[in-house]
Amino acid sequence: MSMRTEYCGLVTEHLLGQTVSLCGWVQRRRDHGGVIFIDLRDREGLVQVVCDPDRAEMFATAEGVRNEFCVQVKGLVRNRPEGTVNAGLKSGKIEVLCHELNVLNPSITPPFQLDDDNLSETTRLTHRVLDLRRPQMQHNLRLRYRVAIEARKYLDEQGFIDIETPMLTKSTPEGARDYLVPSRVNAGQFFALPQSPQLFKQLLMVANFDRYYQITKCFRDEDLRADRQPEFTQIDCETSFLGEQEIRDLFEDMIRHIFKTTINVELDAKFPVMPYSEAMARFGSDKPDLRVKLEFTELTDAMKDVDFKVFSTPANAKDGRVAALRVPKGAELSRGDIDGYTEFVRIYGAKGLAWIKVNEKAKGRDGLQSPIVKNLHDASIAAILERTGAEDGDIIFFAADRAKVVNDSLGALRLKIGHSEFGKANGLVEAGWKPLWVVDFPMFEYDDEDARYVAAHHPFTSPKDEHLEYLESDPGRCLAKAYDMVLNGWEIGGGSVRIHREDVQSKVFRALKIGAEEAQAKFGFLLDALQYGAPPHGGIAFGLDRIVTMMAGADSIRDVIAFPKTQRAQDLLTQAPSPVDERQLRELHIRLRQPEQPAS
């Protein structure tokens, strides 16, 4: 008999009466009055092994095994005694009567129990190998595998070709810092790890491969946020001779296919499409969570002439905004709740949080409860009540500041209230999946510090055809042929139609204050390629880590990556990054300069 004939978790009634050979890890050992029970675990699940003292040598071995010993069991599959069936296990109707037990490798005492759900992330990442043995992590990584397989199946059927692009490439400005790799052969010069395969996949379209994809690692040396990793995985795609709508349709179908085949979820037959300007106006975010039913009400124009400077000053400012958020039944919120929300919005730059409780709308001013009502005239109060559609028992929150602060703070408050226990109890948030496309993004953003425009996405995104004329005269008016797929408030994919004409690409570089000499030095290979009959093309990249996190219901993308980094970009398992010896540095012609310590 071979070392293993079956997986533990797949031993069921169909094997009754058969002798099997199993390999796995001891989940738990129990001694019940002379009979030893072992819960044996492998990647497919658990099976109960019964060790009877009638087989003395085997029983002596069983007495010595402990949690996480790696063992081999040979035995007979039989029904469990009446009353001992475990309906929670796939193998719960049977057990294996052990004939032979071999310890393949003992284990020292693990630093934690695998069923402990209260472990710190530091402990889990330091002992990642043991953490990965836990059923939830096994499930997550197998789900990740299935998502990747289904993406490949779909793309293969659609005629896409899997082509690898370089990991050592040229450093080009794409927003975040590059991870640099020194060249030993070319002293003083550096490769960069790719932030994305963006330029290479465009070159593949010029080279007539028509449809490309790869599931690939990307690298960004940026300040990490809660769900960012210095290295992450993209489902990266590019296609020729398709317009924006056709590209969106193609990849919308892919996401529907993946969700249906991996977690049996039917996404909307047609994803709604929302312009960027509408998303910002209604939700203060370019990735709105449509499960939350709350929306902004625009009040900027109505507050320009009020005596209340907190509202009128931003209402009259060039970059100011005044917006309201009506919360149905919110009048029941306590002053403590409101104070908590006030502190919360300060995180996003808000100076405070104005509010009005609507107790009896019919009484006008007298039916309102708020510290700000006395500062507003009747016409402005009427405008607030009419525009928000407020009813008795509602509360209205206000934000008045620079538009960015209003959008960030009130948008975060919208999500916090919607997903709170209050929000759930009052039907302010729906369950399920709410996908949408956000389109018509600004092509450029103005950088006040550098006094110039920067690319909102990347400098290879095509402007809308009707906005080509603004590239040189008024870049701020340009909208891009860019699109993001958003799901439950997460951007899971983003892409665009690309610039395929050299003259347009050069105009975009000039709008970004990238001169001809700099453009040639950094992007000459692209500009040259575009002159050889480059086809119209576009594409998209999906964040595999993020998609799997959502599907798994995980708390963090670190729960769906086998060996992730911490928020400080450290690998606690291998202790990377780490110093290297002086000889290696000399070979690379590098001398370290330690960062200056701040004066005490």
From Swiss-Prot:
Keywords: Aminoacyl-tRNA synthetase, ATP-binding, Cytoplasm, Ligase, Nucleotide-binding, Protein biosynthesis. It is found in: Cytoplasm. PROSITE patterns: AA_TRNA_LIGASE_II. GO terms for cellular component: cytoplasm. It comes from the Bacteria. Its main location: cytoplasm. ATP binds at residues 220-222, 229, 491, 543-546. This is Aspartate--tRNA(Asp/Asn) ligase. It comes from Burkholderia multivorans (strain ATCC 17616 / 249).
